[in-house]
């Protein structure tokens, strides 16, 4: 018995992440077994034949919850009436490309997407940005969707959090479910700070349970920060199935109240929490309570944690200043 319907836009839908994602949305894994799904799938014009193949496969799965598929290269059509916009597609950094080049190219893309969301999406739209650099892409899209409340924009550090939980569980020799309150602070980049001091293993600080400061500060932190690059080196292309899984998990966190004693990492617009500049898209520890998303307060930092926190904060400030200088922000 279904009692709900959600229309979801997925950009870059024929790409590797999109291909790993859309079947799981259609099966009910993102919004649950009582929510019907309509998919608006966006691709570049040359990729439309491939996208039609994805739509054929979706049809061939005969998902009971999937009620409609739209395949298009028209951004406005893709965003028409959507309740969720999953912005997966972006231009990857290529050899010889400066970070400012990457920000400028993607800035143009996310400017247009923000405008289309503003003009065509449902009044209750929520926006989940995956395409990198996702924090600043989210900031740009948010800036160009003036009619959409800024607290409905998110960027993903869910994959980083899941990577960190796994590394701690393996090192401690415990089940993955024993690891809770694992926070990724800051930017979804190699400066992110996976906070092992405030993470818990069976309710005790992970730093006390593992009790190997060298491993935690050096191996653990760098493994989480560099995991994406390690996957590329190992398989020849970037994380796709794990990224899609993280999108499912991340959106599920945003639509389901958080269990007691748990939190999750999510990039959202700062209101000044923990001294972060208001307006930056920054990854915080979050909880959803009675349908409202809140930043977990009163987490403490030692000198190591504060140093790492400031490094990632400064990188996000730099990205913001760069895109502002490029005319991508008001």
UniProtKB/Swiss-Prot annotation:
The keyword NAD belongs to this UniProt entry's keyword annotation: yes
Residues at which substrate binds: 93, 99, 132, 163
Gene3D superfamilies, alphabetized: Lactate dehydrogenase/glycoside hydrolase, family 4, C-terminal, NAD(P)-binding Rossmann-like Domain
Any one GO MF annotation of this record: L-malate dehydrogenase (NAD+) activity
Source organism superkingdom: Bacteria
Catalyzed reaction equations: (S)-malate + NAD(+) = oxaloacetate + NADH + H(+)
Active site: 188 (proton acceptor)
Keyword Oxidoreductase belongs to the record: yes
Main EC class the enzyme belongs to: oxidoreductase
PROSITE patterns associated with the record: MDH (PS00068)
Record-linked InterPro entries: L-lactate/malate_DH, Lactate/malate_DH_C, Lactate/malate_DH_N, Lactate_DH/Glyco_Ohase_4_C, Malate_DH_AS, Malate_DH_type2, NAD(P)-bd_dom_sf
GO biological process assignments: malate metabolic process; tricarboxylic acid cycle
Any matching Pfam family: Ldh_1_C
Binding site for NAD(+): 12-18, 106, 113, 130-132
Enzyme Commission number, as recorded: 1.1.1.37
Keywords assigned by UniProt, alphabetized: NAD, Oxidoreductase, Tricarboxylic acid cycle
Similarity section: Belongs to the LDH/MDH superfamily. MDH type 2 family.
PANTHER family from the UniProt entry: MALATE DEHYDROGENASE (PTHR23382)
NCBIfam families the UniProt entry points to: MalateDH-SF1, PRK05442.1
Record's function text: Catalyzes the reversible oxidation of malate to oxaloacetate.
Protein name: Malate dehydrogenase
Organism of derivation: Legionella pneumophila (strain Lens)
